[in-house]
Amino acid sequence: MGYNRANLERLDLLTGLGTSTKTATGQGTGIDLQDYEGDILFILDSAAGGGSSPTLDVTIEDSAENSTFAALSGAAFTQVTGSASSQKLSISSDECKRYVRVKFTIGGSSPTFDLSVTGLGLKKYG
């Protein structure tokens, strides 16, 4: 379902990862997609990595019960290294499990990344 005037009032922001500095691998909290329909757009915004040979891999995982998560097929951003990066990817809320979360893997020597991941989705009911 696309975004148009008729459904803009149903557009909702989803926080995958709030803006913060990350120095080690981790993940966000589960996001309940039960009240959403269609595609969910996720936006990664990352400053250039710090440290020596920094790498950042960000993926979306899903879970049926919000406790055991696994990688969602095709839901990986392009690796971020020494340059700032803004990227987007979409997932279908109809084709994944009820909960999703953002997972990030950081590598390198003393790596740091300032980043955020925000989602945009349409609520089923306005």
Question: What does each model-identified segment do?
Answer:
Residues 1-35:
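Solvent-exposed, flexible loop/coil segments flanking beta-strands in beta-rich domains
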Residues 29-31, 85-93:
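Exposed aromatic-hydrophobic patches
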Residues 38-42, 93-113:
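Noncatalytic modules at the cell exterior or secretory-pathway interfaces
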Residues 47-55, 108-112:
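Extended, low-complexity, turn-rich repeat/linker tracts enriched in Gly/Pro/Ser/Thr and Asp/Glu
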Residues 57-61:
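Beta-strand signatures of extracellular beta-sandwich domains
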Residues 71-81:
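Solvent-exposed serine/threonine-rich low-complexity stretches and specific carbohydrate-binding patches
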